[in-house]
Amino acid sequence: MLRGNEAEGVVVAGRKSEDEVSLVPLLPIAAQGGSLNDFVVSVKENDCERVVSPIRGADFAMPVAGDSMAPEYPAGSQIFIKKINERAFIDWGKVYVLDTCNGSVIKRVFPSDNAEKVKCVSINPEYPPFEVSYEDIYGMYRVLLCMSVK
């Protein structure tokens, strides 16, 4: 995912001045709603288009691909995410994007029986849960908002 400087995403409701609107990088890779693949992508911030964040605190936006997180996070929707320190605190049961050595994936995250891993669970029951080792996670991003066309 994003390597280098990270933008701050703060939007002040009701403000129309361009100086007061928050633009966040739209990552040119999708969070896979499925299982991890073997594709590693490194993105530089200046390679990213910027989009207006409709929510305070978002660091990045990215598209969702696949249907494992449908219907809440359908393919083609755009999510706004915030980087967290996964070593300090994880809000178990919430949806995160995990940037891993095998690609980026969007999943509901739970503790694993193995203290060195997290359990990733899809909303769509057709997709089985899987585990990811902390050492394979480059970053965890809490999903703050999902926008989709209805």
Residue ranges and their predicted role:
Residues 55-150:
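Acidic/glycine-rich C-terminal interaction modules and beta/coil loop segments
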Residues 1-75, 85-88, 147-150:
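Short, positionally conserved secondary-structure boundary motifs
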